A protein has these predicted regions:
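N-terminal secretory signal peptides that target proteins for export/translocation
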Residues: 1-4
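A cross-family detector of function-defining hotspots
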Residues: 31-141
Length: 141
């Protein structure tokens, strides 16, 4: 019985750690910085928002913060190569917010809509670099 308890403790610890590995849309700057690594550039935008480019492992993470919360995130490879389907799925899942993502095939570029209609994603070439962009959809209530 002790082995089973130890195994369960290890599994629980791994899942708890993994829940903090990925930051996502709406997270604060501290969590994003802990997850996305070294800051390469930081710019204050005209509207008061802040754009930050991070580098960690083989990825660039570009994030726009408004009121200290992430309102747009872009993911790309440092080498400028395409993200794999697995990588795209992983980034979308990190930004699911409890919802699911589905392809939106009404456009020439690859688009994804979140099932709760609170965010959208596009995978397109930006400045010569294949990039996944995730942003909230602002709906009126």
């Amino acid at each position: 019985m002790t082995d089973v308890k130890q195994f369960l403790v290890v599994v629980l610890a791994v899942f708890t750690a993994l829940s903090w590995v990925w930051a996502n849309l709406g997270d604060n700057g501290d969590k994003i910085e802990d997850s996305y690594g070294q800051i390469i550039e930081r710019h204050l935008l005209d509207d008061g928002a802040v754009s930050v480019l991070y580098h960690k492992d083989r990825y660039f993470y570009f994030v726009i913060f408004a009121d200290r919360r992430s309102v747009l995130e872009r993911y790309s490879h440092v080498k400028g190569t395409d993200l794999s389907e697995k990588e795209i799925t992983r980034f979308l899942k990190a930004n699911a917010g409890g919802a699911t993502w589905a392809p939106d095939d009404k456009s020439k570029e690859r688009r994804f809509k979140r099932s709760d209609h609170k965010a959208e994603a596009t995978y397109a070439n930006m400045a010569g670099r294949p990039t996944l962009t995730v942003r909230p959809l602002h709906t009126e209530r």
